[in-house]
Design a protein with these regions (language model features):
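Membrane-water interface segments at the C-terminal ends of transmembrane alpha-helices
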Residues: 7-40, 55-170, 196-218
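Extracytoplasmic catalytic/substrate-binding loops of multi-pass membrane glycan-assembly enzymes
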Residues: 42-47, 227-228
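A short amphipathic helical element positioned immediately N-terminal to and/or at the very start
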Residues: 1-2, 45-54
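Contiguous mid-protein beta-loop-alpha structural module that forms a pocket-lining wall or clamp
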Residues: 212, 221-227
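Hydrophobic positions on the alpha-helical face of helix-turn-helix-like DNA-binding modules
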Residues: 179-180, 190, 194
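Short coil/turn motifs that cap or connect alpha-helices
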Residues: 94, 185-186
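Helix-turn-helix DNA-binding elements, focusing on the entry/boundary residues of the two helices
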Residues: 176
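Glycine/proline-centered hinge or cleavage motifs at structural transition points of membrane proteins
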Residues: 183-185, 197
Length: 228
């Protein structure tokens, strides 16, 4: 009886959440899609709105630039997150538990605040920029433009790759690695032939989430882009 009550309670909560999701997320998206392909005067199917959108170079170039930044940021985030997860899982490093916590916490900061923090560090008048200028006499342009956007996005997003890959490595059977080592495979060969194929689904899942987060972020390019 108690089990049935708990089941009904959680089922009711799930249905309530589903209703809110349909009303406030699914329905507005369907309505926008409907209005984008229906002519309000003739009520006929039309693609004029999409034609006008892609005919303007400004919108088209913005979409291409966003895609370019997103792909580069996702690749760099994967290059950082994958080896870091493997090293922290495979090598006993003092304080690795605290480092793992810091990596996860760094992902929790909002992108807008993270971008502003990087400007305070590496902007034209940033803390690190002023130190380099005062010691070496080198005046840096700061962390602006395409390279700055990609760098900030990658450093903001790599913890997601790290968490996914780290979870996959935690569930791997160590006997596979030991068997490969007994067969004479080098560390690089073990990573390339055994570890990487097994964690690839988690890596792709994390990369997809990074791609969506970066592509939908407006605050970071607005602060760092400077017209890119």
């Amino acid at each position: 009886m108690n089990t049935a009550k708990k089941f009904n309670l959680w089922m009711g909560i799930a249905l309530l959440i589903l209703c809110f999701f349909i009303i406030f997320v699914v329905y507005p998206l369907i309505l926008i899609l409907y209005k984008s392909v229906i002519d309000p005067e003739s009520s006929k199917l039309t693609l004029d709105y999409f034609t006008k959108f892609f005919a303007r170079k400004y919108y088209w170039s913005t979409l291409v630039n966003s895609f370019y930044v997103t792909v580069c940021s996702t690749i760099i985030a994967s290059v950082i997150g994958l080896p870091m997860a493997y090293v922290l899982r495979s090598v006993k490093i003092p304080g690795s538990k605290y480092l793992n916590i810091l990596i996860v916490i760094s992902y929790l900061s909002p992108p807008f605040i993270g971008a502003y923090a990087w400007i305070q560090l590496l902007g034209r008048n940033g803390f690190v920029t002023q130190i380099i200028n005062s010691i070496f006499g080198v005046k840096l342009d700061g962390i602006y433009g395409f390279a700055g956007i990609v760098l900030v996005f990658a450093l903001q997003s790599f913890p997601l790759i790290y968490m996914y890959v780290s979870g996959a490595l935690k569930n791997l059977d160590n006997s596979l690695n030991e068997a490969a080592e007994s067969l004479g495979l080098t560390a690089f060969q073990r990573v390339r032939q055994i570890i990487l194929p097994l964690v690839m689904p988690s890596l792709l899942a994390g990369s997809l989430l990074v791609f969506m987060r970066v592509f939908s972020d407006f605050g970071t390019p607005m602060l760092i882009g400077e017209g890119f």
